[in-house]
């Protein structure tokens, strides 16, 4: 909670003085920060880059004050002491940064399910029995210890699901991000 109140207080004390990087307009990083701004009252200006590398370079160099990024991509910079992780999204702490509290632990529950996810998709007319068989096969592979370990090392959390659960997640994310885009008046470049 300390970091949030300090950030918000600083942004109120000097309006327009704080900024944040993202790898581009409308990216998950951009939307996550807009959701955080809305939930916390933070006043910060978006600085969109053409990709993650420029955003990270300017964060490390101090040209921007903050950004959302994956723990995995920020880890080399945190280990060198050039970047400090302030909070993680998700319902539990990151295995790669167990000492960093979640947003929820710091009083911002709206960031709980802000995370990147990967899914395997098939064409809409794929037969249901084939979808179910492929899903079972993918779950079997994802539950193998060596696969879990490799993905965890890359900062991912293995959460296999059913096609129906994926459909629910997609609908829920679309509704949440549509509201963020509308409220923040984000327009396509």
Q: Which ranges hold each PLM region?
A:
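Paired acidic/hydrophobic, glycine-rich loop segments that form the ligand-binding mouth/hinge
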Residues: 19, 65-69, 84-87, 177-179
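Ligand-binding "clamshell"
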Residues: 42-43, 77-88, 95-108, 180
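Beta->alpha turn/N-cap motifs
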Residues: 52, 69-74, 89-91, 116, ...
